[in-house]
Amino acid sequence: MKIAVVGGGSTYTPELVDGFARLGSMVTELVLIDPAADRLAVVGAFSQRIFRRYGHPGSVTWTTDLDAGVTGADVAVIQLRVGGQIARISDETFPLACGCVGQETTGAGGLAKALRTVPVVLDVADRIRARAREGAWIVDFTNPVGIVTRALLDAGHKAVGLCNVAIGFQRRFAGLLRVDPSTVVLDHAGLNHLTWERAAYVDGVDRLPELLARHLPELAGAVEIPAEVLATLGCVPSYYLNYFYNHDKVVREERDAPTRGQRVAEIEATLLDMYRDPSLDEKPALLGERGGAYYSEAAVGLIAAL
């Protein structure tokens, strides 16, 4: 299987590469594609070292040529950030002037990101369709995932969007219940960030009432939503629902704090310095602060099932 990653120069890419390496011989070729040549070379070389650490027989290459990179691909992952972190910081700040939440996937900021991103993703997808293998899948990681993936589907692309909210809940619930995550089956209502967990089945038995009874403060704290809201709902909302349930509080907090984009930009600069170390061959702990917990696990499971 050839996997092409569009936006492969992201500092997050090594998280994906680590997951792809664990797919074993299923992945024969991994191509990272990005217009930022210097950054791509750093991430690409580090990705090669990750594959070697696992003893993976597949090749890892990189290119700034989108058309060449996606040619013959079985799966194309799209993880773009049009405008980079500078645009993200704008998305997280301009809504505050209107008394609205500033966030890259929700509200006015999310809509602005979608308007910038969808045309670019559709162009990329058209080029993938023209050059990838017949029947190739597009896997979208690009936020806002719901809007971007819907645009891909409406344009007739064979695409699926991936979000880490569900797998994050699965892992958290499994830890609290002290069971293997694979045994937890969620009743996951909603799409992408606008979601609620209505049940958590283990061996056919819904254990969510038990979780709410025994771990309500912990669950509420994890999603930053008042415990009384969870108790009233009888389910666990995505932490993104905090922007709706606690809108005014979030706006006040955002006005007094650095944006998430500013923090991510700082983390990215440090990560790139770390990736340049030729002795580094495993993802650093700092990558966990970049965001996207469990994305590689979700991606591995999804791509293996395609």
Model regions: which residues?
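Conserved glycine-rich cofactor-binding loop
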Residues: G9
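NAD(P)-binding Rossmann-fold cofactor-contacting core
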Residues: M26-I50
